Amino acid sequence: MKALLLIAHGSRRQQSNDEVVELADKLKKNSVGQYDIIHAGFLELAETLIPDGIKKCVDDGATSIVILPYFLNSGRHVIEDIPEIVNATKPLYPEADIKIAPHLGASELMMDLLISSANSTR
């Protein structure tokens, strides 16, 4: 089974964390046939942390996990912190193929999204 773990920074503001969880729930509904399991996880400041999110995916039956950093820029968290946490967690789940996708801001679709968002001003 294939899983997607959407990783955000995490916030002291619970509403911000809830938005990420809600986004993961929307992804579940819109990605039928692409991912069997979709969860949200956080780098820090909120539950579920990355190692716990990976465990949740494996416990749900995932044999392949894509970690998607929900970050716009390739700062330290994207370049160092997330890979370090994922690489430290991988040995705990040798039955799962765990890979990190490029961060959201690296997507070629970002230009269209920015223009569309700017054009939708109120």
Where are these regions (language model features)?
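Active-site-proximal alpha-helix that buttresses catalytic centers in soluble enzyme cores
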Residues: 1-122
